[in-house]
């Protein structure tokens, strides 16, 4: 085993580049990894410990060293190819330029793989989730925007080939959405969606505005991981279950049967309701699914607060009141304020496909680097 190999790869790349290439697509001026590389001794100690002895890396260690070796070889290839840029043969110089571009792309991918191998996955990453959207400041315009965001996530679920089931849906008078929730399940659904929680702000001329003025409205997204039976056990004695007649849309059975269900978790006071379906049994099942997600989220928050001290990871530990993203329609731009990243072409972004997925990946990348900083601060 050669634990120093990983360190040498990181040190060599840092000396030549100064920043992590996998982060080039992020608009970040103070990446945690820059700070990390500035303390080279800490990184070296950490890598030698992890690759050399840490039990958590016993499974990953062969893969980590293999990827590090590939990266070291690719770095050497890049260095040798760069010398050809000064060759007298123009065709050879052009060939070298193409090879350098290809090498740099592969180096970025390999470096990214190493970061992923160093940062342990979270317990909830493979979980399904509950999505909740709620209109905020801005009246009917906020409700219209809430409806668009809910649709965007439904389309994103289809794009990722996840299962999407609406649990609640309370529309407004003009086609907007006051509040809605959905169950989303699929491959690493929570891992992709966990950074979407927070306040989303829209700036545009509302459909209801007659004088053409730009308004600012908000809506809130909550992302709650769904627990497994092992993760969370609820004592039936801790629950109070009430039934009532449903109100609002629902066809001929509205207000004729006690189909709506309200569940109260007595120890915490957390409430979960559902009247989406005509069947009381189905509504109870959906309400319990939401309640379990809320209780599990509370449990995770308590564990997280114990785990992290004064230095907080910037993404994923802030409250739901935090403004995370602005959708500026006049400028055709969406900006995520946590990583200072902007994307243009809002219409395409709101379709919930490639552009949203790009932003989700950027958030995951940045969170991984922050996690690595936190881990090293504790270990070294």
Curated annotation (Swiss-Prot):
Modified positions (N5-methylglutamine) in chain numbering: 252
Q: Where is this motif: GGQ?
A: 250-252
What residue spans carry the region label GGQ domain?
236-300
One GO biological process term is: mitochondrial translational termination
Q: Which GO terms describe its molecular function?
A: translation release factor activity
| Sorted UniProt keywords | Coiled coil, Methylation, Mitochondrion, Protein biosynthesis, Transit peptide
One cellular-component annotation, GO = mitochondrion
Q: Which residues form a coiled coil?
A: 63-118
* Xref: PROSITE patterns: RF_PROK_I
Q: In the database record, which residues form the transit peptide?
A: 1-25
* Location of the protein in the cell: Mitochondrion
Q: Which NCBIfam families match?
A: PRK00591.1 (NF001859)
Q: Please state what the annotation says regarding this protein's domains.
A: The GGQ domain interacts with the peptidyltransferase center (PTC) of the large ribosomal subunit to trigger nascent chain hydrolysis.
Instruction: State what protein this is by name.
Output: Peptide chain release factor 1-like, mitochondrial
Source organism per entry reads: Bos taurus (Bovine)
Q: Which lineage?
A: Eukaryota, Metazoa, Chordata, Craniata, Vertebrata
Gene symbol of the encoding locus: MTRF1L
């Amino acid at each position: 085993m050669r634990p120093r190999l990983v360190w040498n790869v990181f040190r060599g790349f840092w000396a030549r580049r100064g920043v992590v290439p996998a982060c080039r697509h992020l608009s970040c001026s103070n990446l945690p990894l820059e700070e990390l590389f500035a303390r080279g001794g800490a990184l070296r100690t950490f890598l030698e410990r992890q690759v050399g002895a840490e039990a958590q890396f016993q499974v990953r260690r062969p893969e980590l060293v293999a990827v590090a070796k590939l990266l070291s070889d690719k770095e050497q290839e890049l260095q040798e190819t760069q010398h050809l840029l000064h060759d007298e043969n123009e065709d050879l110089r052009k060939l070298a330029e193409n090879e350098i571009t290809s090498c740099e792309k592969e180096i970025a991918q390999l470096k990214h793989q190493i970061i992923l191998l160093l940062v342990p996955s979270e317990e909830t990453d493979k979980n399904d989730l509950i999505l909740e959207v709620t209109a905020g400041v801005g009246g009917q315009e906020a409700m219209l925007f809430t409806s668009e965001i809910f649709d965007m996530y439904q389309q994103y679920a289809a794009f990722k080939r996840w299962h999407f089931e609406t649990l609640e849906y309370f529309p407004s008078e003009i086609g907007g959405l006051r509040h809605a929730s959905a169950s989303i399940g699929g491959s690493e659904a929570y891992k992709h969606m966990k950074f979407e929680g927070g306040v989303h702000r829209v700036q545009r001329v509302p459909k209801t505005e007659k004088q053409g003025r730009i308004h600012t409205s908000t809506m809130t997204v909550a992302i709650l991981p769904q627990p497994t039976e092992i993760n969370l056990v609820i004592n039936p004695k801790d629950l109070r279950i009430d039934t009532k007649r449903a109100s609002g849309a629902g066809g001929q059975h509205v207000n004729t049967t006690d189909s709506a269900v309200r569940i109260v978790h007595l120890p915490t006071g957390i409430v979960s309701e559902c009247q989406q379906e005509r069947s009381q049994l189905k509504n109870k099942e959906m309400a319990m699914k939401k309640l379990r997600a809320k209780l599990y989220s509370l449990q995770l928050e308590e564990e997280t607060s114990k785990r992290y001290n004064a230095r907080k990871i910037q993404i994923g530990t802030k409250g739901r009141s935090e403004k995370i993203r602005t959708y500026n329609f006049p400028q055709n731009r969406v900006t995520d304020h946590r990583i200072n990243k902007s994307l243009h072409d809002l219409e395409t972004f709101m379709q919930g496909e490639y552009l949203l997925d790009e932003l989700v990946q950027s958030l995951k990348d940045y969170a991984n680097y922050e996690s690595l900083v936190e881990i090293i601060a504790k270990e070294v």
